[in-house]
Amino acid sequence: MTSATAAYRAARDDLLGLRGQQVRAIDEFRWPDVGEQFNWAIDWFDAIARGNNRTALVIEEDGSSTERSFDEMARRSDQVATWLTAHGVAKGDAVLVMLGNQVELWEAMLAIMKLGAVIMPTSTAAGPGDLADRIARGNAGYVLCGPADVPKFADVTGEYIRLAVGAVDGWADLHDAYDLPAERAAHPGTAPGDTLLLYFTSGTTSKPKLVEHTHASYPIGHLSTMYWLGVRPGDVHLNISSPGWAKHAWSCFFAPWIAEATVFLYNYSRFDASALLAQLREREVSSFCAPPTVWRMLIKADLSGGPGALREVVSAGEPLNPEVIEQVRRHWGVTIRDGYGQTETTAQVGNCPDEPVKPGSMGRPLPGVPVVLLDPVTGARAGAGGEGEICLDLSRHPLPLMTGYQGDSQRNDEAMAGGYYHTGDVAALDDEGYLTYIGRTDDVFKASDYKISPFELESVLIEHPAVAEAAVVPAPDPIRLAIPKAYIALAPGREPSEQTAFEILKYAREHLAPYQRVRRVEFFELPKTISGKIRRVELRAQENARRASGTAAEHEYDAE
């Protein structure tokens, strides 16, 4: 066992031992000193995996399953690392990884990490335009995807090497890796501060930001996420999340394997609450994490005869309504615990296991995460009973924080202004240290647990010849919490009609990823400030008031 492994294990075990003692954990926990060299895939995963035949990964789909032990994952990721090396992947190279929930995704992530290369996770929902932008801005020298997504790269230019999980003309086949000797690839050595991950995350007025994480910020920082989840050694952990997004790495990769738990994935083409409940029972899932959209769908199913092994249930991404929490508690005898974090960080705030849960609250700051609330105008710290922007105190060196937005000094200056990292989210603080989420300081919103940037959707909408201006806001929805609705100012000579709405919605559907789908349009003169900026806050308020009163707009049309 290396000194880095020993330090990491000691920190992990400290948090496991402080279960149900969050206040004490906040006071006592210290991030491990792993020294000048640290690689989580080698110093942690391989250390717990070699000779370990317990199940590390289970993927269930269409009645069949694929399983890998910890030892198999260690050996197979070595084979993939050797194969990647043969194709030129070296320390510092960026690899765009666009795979679904399949074993090769986990093996590739471990392998890329072992080589000191950079993982650029990408959703399979991304289209050619998104891919071209990511390859260019992320300086990706390699692309790894499944055969079904290969056609998306046909017109994506760039000097990148094409790698596929399967036989495709002109692309190297990753399956060839498994014919290679299971020997450890040469490890170049990685420092904790070396770049490990590049995530694209949406902003309000520009293209997605490029978030840079290191071999410390996520691999070590997710110790706090493990503490919030409550996952333990030997658990079976299921997280509902799509690959390519940070939450997938949080809860399908780092946190459960930090705890030495089994990662269980359930793939489905269409959500079926009854089928998911059956999997929870059959697989004896003990720890379950799902976005509010899934929880709202689950309570519409028969919750009787709940999963007997289920101990931890958590939700993240957006506030969860109390009725959902109450129904699950009544039927299953467990309480859904909320948490909060960002792509830019690990989990920051959470209701932790064996701690009192306050309805509507997302909990207290997690161990090692220096959360403060600052007044957005004055910058003063908010005390009990106050509210402010959720920030991290940079003077306390928050380890789980990104290095910054790569190649964007202006955004970095804004995000790190005044000695604090600014999340852009506002919360209220009570006298026991619990935080309750209020909303965003900007216009980004979530729909079905996907972060939506109005700017990205509006940029596509205004390409349509009938659209002069567009403003996208969240429209309340009982299942998805919100759906993207577009307020449209029509071009001269165009009249509001069902046919025009259909054409615009069709165009948007063809040019946006499925999760970005605009589901409603209204033809409306956009309210603006004196300087000409669209007042989305006014549109949001109007939307909420209409839905609350059940009032329909004259020129509103649905995509359904």
Regions found by a protein language model. Give the residues of each.
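Conserved ATP/PPi-binding loop(s) of AMP-dependent carboxylate-activating enzymes
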Residues: 365-368, 380-414, 452
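AMP-binding/adenylate-forming catalytic domain of the ANL superfamily
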Residues: 512-534, 552-560
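AMP-binding/adenylate-forming catalytic core of the ANL superfamily
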Residues: 126-127, 143-146, 288, 411, ...
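Conserved pre-ATP/AMP-binding loop-to-beta segment of ANL
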Residues: 53-55, 169, 179-200, 206-207, ...
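Gly/Ser/Thr-rich phosphate-binding loop
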Residues: 258, 285-289, 299-358, 370
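Conserved AMP-binding/adenylation subdomain of ANL enzymes
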Residues: 219-236, 244-286, 301
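Conserved AMP-binding A3 loop
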Residues: 66-71, 196-220
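ANL superfamily adenylate-forming
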Residues: 62, 142, 148-192, 207, ...
